[in-house]
Amino acid sequence: MKIKLLTLAVASLVSVNALAVSIDYRHEMQDTAQAGHKDRLLISHRFANGFGLSSEVKWAQSSADKTPNKPFNEQVSNGTEVVASYVYKFNSVFSIEPGFSLESGSSNNNYRPYLRGRANVTDDLSVALRYRPYFKRNSGNIGKDNTMDKGYTLTGNIDYTFLKDYTIGYELEYKKGTSGKTILSDNDDYDITHNVKLSYKWDKNWKPYVEVGNVSGSETTDERQTRYRVGVQYSF
């Protein structure tokens, strides 16, 4: 059923306006013995009126497979996400984007409305801030105490374009658990993630990129891990 819905969403995006579709593939690994290889494919479109749609599918190495540091091995579904949003531009500097994200796994659905504000400080520098609460329904826990996790994330971004075709960005995300499962990192009810992204606009279609992030490695200790990502975006 999920595959049918994803196929329908992709077909709708492509058929509406093939000149404004972006396809983004990304591979991820962490600095651990297992490496935690993951992949995701994102297809998105922003209409001329500001309305946008995106669909994302994710894969990860099966938890039952203990083969260390082997990408694309025993991959299984790692969830899907569909996002609908609308960008309203006040002027050439300020814009606001309300949206809604539905993230689904094999035993849960995560409902995440959000609001993002963006400012183009200069032609090369932009900043953004997003507030996104989450309401995660754990269908796998029906009949148990914890069937709903609630909280929110605050995400700040700063992006700078240099040498015409290069863009470097820094992202800081703060996640807070308020009810249900609230232990997120180091026995605390919050978690912080840092991420740096460097992209290169090869031409009007291709944009490869690399990312390096610092993420929590445990819910009960102060362990931190380095996360590496490499990907490419194709727009047509």
UniProtKB/Swiss-Prot annotation:
Monomer. Belongs to the oligogalacturonate-specific porin KdgM (TC 1.B.35) family. PANTHER family: OUTER MEMBRANE PROTEIN (PTHR38105:SF5), OUTER MEMBRANE PROTEIN-RELATED-RELATED (PTHR38105). It is found in: Cell outer membrane. GO terms for molecular function: porin activity; voltage-gated monoatomic ion channel activity. It comes from the Bacteria. Its main location: membrane. This is Oligogalacturonate-specific porin KdgM. Keywords: Cell outer membrane, Ion transport, Membrane, Porin, Signal, Sugar transport, Transmembrane, Transmembrane beta strand, Transport, Virulence. Pfam families: KdgM (PF06178). One of its GO terms (cellular component) is cell outer membrane. Induction: Induced by pectin or pectin derivatives. Controlled by KdgR, ExuR, PecS and catabolite repression via CRP. Residues 1-20 form the signal peptide.
